[in-house]
């Protein structure tokens, strides 16, 4: 997610972000520059071979989900609300690409939520994505953020973190107590892991460190946050309706991004990814690992569907999945138009 988000106009006038990322996993989005052991043999494969592998896996993935993506359409009401809310943000020009990212993810994956909730999601995402960039994170002085929440101090957080804190405080107005608390704790985990990643770049993974790779993947990409966003309090006040689906929904969010990012990462020769780290530590090729991840992600999706059963909670999940995939498929950053 360290890439600068750009916005392009399509021939029919739809605005589509070309470099969206929301979180490591959104690396929604994603690997936060995971440490590498060595270059994967997949990097040197012919681009056509990479494309063939990715095409087969992604087509299988989408077919299993029965996803039919629709073109991204703008949400004027959402854009107006976000523009008003961010008008006085500090350093707004620098944050503008990330604000666009927030709008698009809210308009696609969370289209089933109310306008007020979509607006809050867009604002939260804008700052979260911005803080995934090392220079912005450093300038925000995030290192003292966690401690400041537990102490009485006159030292206030940076302007951008203070804005994020105010946004976080509003989560209880839009999500059940459990969901809002998950958003807070997951946010703190993201910041903590992101700072650790920046402090330990180049650290070689121990061959027995697979549990750490899994742990890092679950903490550096907001999966719990973006799962909690699916079910807003106004329509889903009782968390018991969906709570057992949360772990598998988190896996779907993380691994879904890994699958849909695979082609552009392989074509660019990127090796600091979850799939590459997992392949190295398990002794498999990245192609074999991709296929495993696809199977695990489809399984997670099925289990969420089974747990939710029929009804509005399942409808919200289906809407999220369709929008989440659309976010990737119609985003030029992921280069999926070259495959599908």
Swiss-Prot record:
Name of the protein: Terpene synthase 29
Transmembrane portions of the chain: none
Pfam hit, one: TRI5
Binding of Mg(2+) 2, residues: 257, 261, 265
InterPro entries documented for this protein: Isoprenoid_synthase_dom_sf, Trichodiene_synth
Magnesium found in the keyword field: yes
Species in which this protein is naturally found: Postia placenta (strain ATCC 44394 / Madison 698-R) (Brown rot fungus)
Function: Terpene cyclase that catalyzes the cyclization of farnesyl diphosphate (FPP) to a single major terpene scaffold whose chemical structure is still unknown.
Gene3D superfamilies noted in UniProt: Farnesyl Diphosphate Synthase
């Amino acid at each position: 997610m360290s890439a600068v988000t750009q916005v392009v106009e399509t021939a029919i006038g739809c605005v589509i972000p070309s470099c969206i990322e929301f979180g490591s996993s959104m690396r929604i989005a994603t690997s936060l520059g995971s440490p590498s052991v060595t270059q994967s043999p997949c990097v040197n494969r012919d681009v056509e071979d990479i494309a063939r592998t990715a095409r087969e896996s992604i087509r299988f993935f989408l077919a299993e989900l029965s996803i039919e993506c629709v073109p991204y359409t703008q949400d004027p009401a959402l854009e107006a609300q976000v523009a008003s809310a961010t008008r006085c943000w500090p350093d707004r020009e620098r944050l503008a690409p990330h604000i666009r990212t927030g709008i698009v993810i809210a308009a696609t994956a969370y289209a089933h939520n109310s306008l007020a909730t979509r607006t809050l999601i867009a604002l939260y995402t804008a700052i979260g994505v911005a803080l995934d960039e090392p220079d912005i994170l450093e300038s925000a002085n995030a290192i003292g953020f966690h401690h400041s929440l537990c102490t009485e101090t006159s030292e206030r957080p940076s302007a951008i973190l203070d804005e994020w804190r105010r946004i976080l405080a509003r989560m209880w107005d839009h999500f059940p107590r459990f969901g809002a608390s998950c958003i807070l704790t997951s946010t703190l985990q993201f910041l903590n892991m992101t700072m650790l990643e920046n402090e330990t770049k180049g650290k070689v993974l121990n061959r027995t460190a697979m549990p750490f790779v899994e742990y890092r993947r679950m903490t550096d990409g907001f999966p719990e946050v973006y799962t909690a966003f699916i079910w807003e309090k106004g329509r889903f006040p009782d968390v018991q309706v969906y709570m057992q689906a949360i772990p598998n929904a988190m896996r779907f969010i993380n691994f879904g991004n890994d699958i849909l990012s695979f082609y552009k990462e392989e074509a660019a020769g990127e090796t600091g990814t979850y799939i590459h780290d997992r392949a190295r530590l398990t002794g498999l090729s990245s192609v074999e690992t991709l296929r495993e991840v696809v199977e695990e992600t489809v399984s997670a999706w099925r289990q969420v569907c089974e747990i939710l059963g029929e009804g509005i909670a399942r409808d919200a999940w289906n809407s999220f999945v369709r929008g989440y995939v659309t976010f990737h498929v119609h985003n030029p950053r992921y280069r999926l138009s070259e495959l599908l």
